[in-house]
């Protein structure tokens, strides 16, 4: 049966500036009501550091030409760049009967299950949200909840330049090493991994009527 809680709009945004995406998802969340269909956006960002609400200035270890944006998501500082799959989840949590912790678990489990399909063993850490392979972080998470609805989401390192992570304490953890799919032997591109990750997510979110839009 086609009801609001079974419908999803999936938007492939291509490469888009972080500030543009942030403003768009903030506006979407402010303007949505009980009849608004949930959306998931998939995007790659040009190189940018984003600082979460809990972020501390000292976690930026070195200044460079890479811009820094103060965001309204949870968490600390992280880095986005081409070759990283960013997924924004614009979900009415009340309608889906989800709390924040449950949505975090959905994101973590989806990445873990996807990597397992390619013999990459990944885990979540209860005290440090994200996904890790052999102690190295492969995916970062950060959410914002407004009016009972989520925005922001996750970033999965696929095939990117990881060196700017050395300019920060990733997610506030000094010395935290980062990894990516390519380094773990998974050679699919961002475009190839995106629908596979959505498929894993939807095994838990259970949208039965999905409409896809390509905005590149």
Swiss-Prot record:
Pfam families in UniProt: LplA-B_cat (PF21948)
Alphabetical GO biological process terms: protein modification process
InterPro entries: aa-tRNA-synth_II/BPL/LPL, BPL_LPL_catalytic, Octanoyltransferase, Octanoyltransferase_CS
Keyword Transferase in annotation: yes
EC number assigned by the record: 2.3.1.181
Record's keyword annotation contains Chloroplast: no
Coiled coil: none
Site positions per UniProt: Lowers pKa of active site Cys: 137
UniProt name for this protein: Octanoyltransferase
Gene name, Swiss-Prot/TrEMBL: lipB
């Amino acid at each position: 049966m086609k009801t609001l809680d079974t419908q999803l709009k999936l938007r492939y945004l291509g490469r888009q500036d972080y500030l543009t995406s942030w403003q768009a998802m903030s506006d979407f969340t402010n303007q949505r009501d009980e009849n608004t269909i949930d959306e998931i956006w998939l995007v790659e960002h040009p190189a940018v550091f984003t600082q979460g609400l809990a972020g501390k200035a000292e976690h930026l270890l070195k200044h460079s030409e890479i811009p820094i944006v103060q965001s309204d998501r949870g968490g600390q500082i992280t880095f986005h760049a081409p070759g990283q799959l960013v997924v924004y989840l614009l979900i009415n949590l009340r309608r889906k009967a989800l709390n924040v912790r449950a949505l975090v678990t959905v994101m973590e489990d989806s990445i873990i299950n996807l990597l397992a399909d390619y013999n990459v063993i990944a885990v979540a850490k209860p005290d440090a949200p994200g996904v890790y392979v052999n102690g190295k972080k492969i995916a970062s998470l950060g959410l914002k909840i407004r009016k009972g609805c989520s925005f922001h989401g996750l970033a999965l390192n696929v095939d990117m330049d990881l060196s700017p992570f050395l300019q920060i304490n990733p997610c506030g953890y000094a010395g935290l090493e980062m990894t990516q799919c390519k380094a773990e032997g998974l050679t699919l591109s961002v475009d190839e991994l995106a629908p596979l990750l959505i498929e894993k997510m939807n095994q838990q979110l259970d949208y039965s009527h999905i409409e896809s839009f390509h905005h590149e």
